[in-house]
């Protein structure tokens, strides 16, 4: 968190996000961080893809894994169009990471995909919301944030256990998200422009996993980011590079007192 984050009173809340209800039936105070920024997820993904290709890598989409087997000191990964061979493989399959491990004959970690839902709504007519901050209630509740000048995204912070799948929102959770917005703001929700769900996958201890499987040579876990994959990707990339290639632990991670053992899949085998 920014050192410039500060507590604000209800009148300040009304100035920053004018639709929020304040007072006894609403918000009476808050914490405001003027230095927080929203990540451009598409720009990050495209930039990383370009960096991968520039380094000689390739991205093969629409290539579902049909089999993984260990042959000698190598792994062979089968897809409908081609098989790939390497002395090490990285399991970064998100909600499917445990399934990929099982396919490879590696013990799963007990990862749990949790469904989360987003709705897109319109602010009051003529109101530009582009400068509004990401706004979240303390504890359970909801959050909302602007997307451009004329649309808001809202989330009820649902965490519904799910099988790995192309998650779809359910009507009850959509209604809950709209109700929470109406309870916390002066905006009546007359229309939901769009709705979708995604899966956030957690290890049993809620910490991310990066490291070689203790029961399989050359099988590297990179999973369990719990919905914070974009935010943690620079640090997790440094950790994964060091751990997979046997390099010195990166100084930025050491400076934050992050220990490789905290990420190791071995911690989940005790």
Give the ranges of each region predicted by the language model:
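C-terminal lid/capping helical subdomain adjacent to the catalytic/cofactor pocket in oxidative enzymes
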Residues: 7, 214-270
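Short loop/edge segments at beta-strand edges and connector loops
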Residues: 9, 61-63, 79, 194-196
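Mid-domain beta-loop-alpha active-site segment that forms a flexible
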Residues: 32-51, 94-96, 173-180, 229-232, ...
């Amino acid at each position: 968190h920014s050192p410039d984050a500060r507590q604000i009173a209800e009148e300040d809340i009304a100035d920053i996000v004018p639709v929020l209800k304040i007072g006894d039936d609403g918000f009476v105070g808050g914490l405001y961080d003027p230095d927080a920024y929203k990540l451009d997820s598409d720009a990050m993904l495209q930039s990383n893809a370009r960096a991968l290709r520039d380094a000689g890598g390739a991205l093969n989409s629409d290539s579902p894994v049909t089999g993984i087997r260990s042959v000698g000191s190598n792994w062979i990964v089968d897809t409908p169009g081609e098989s790939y061979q390497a002395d090490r493989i990285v399991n970064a399959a998100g909600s499917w990471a445990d399934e990929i491990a099982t396919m490879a004959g590696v013990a799963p970690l007990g990862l749990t995909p949790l469904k989360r839902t987003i709705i897109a709504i319109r602010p009051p007519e003529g109101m530009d919301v582009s400068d509004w901050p990401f706004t979240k209630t303390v504890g359970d509740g909801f959050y909302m944030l602007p997307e451009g000048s004329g649309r808001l995204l809202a989330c009820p912070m649902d965490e519904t256990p799910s099988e790995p799948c192309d998650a779809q929102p359910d009507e009850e959770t959509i209604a809950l998200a709209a109700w929470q917005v109406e309870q916390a703001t002066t905006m009546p929700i007359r229309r939901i422009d769009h709705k979708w769900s995604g899966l956030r996958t957690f290890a049993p201890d809620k910490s991310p996993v990066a490291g070689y499987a203790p029961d399989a040579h050359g099988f590297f876990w990179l999973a369990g980011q719990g919905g914070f994959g974009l935010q943690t990707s620079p640090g997790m990339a440094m950790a994964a590079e060091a751990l997979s290639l046997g390099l010195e632990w990166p100084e930025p991670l050491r400076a934050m007192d992050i220990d490789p053992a905290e990420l190791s899949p071995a911690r989940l085998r005790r």
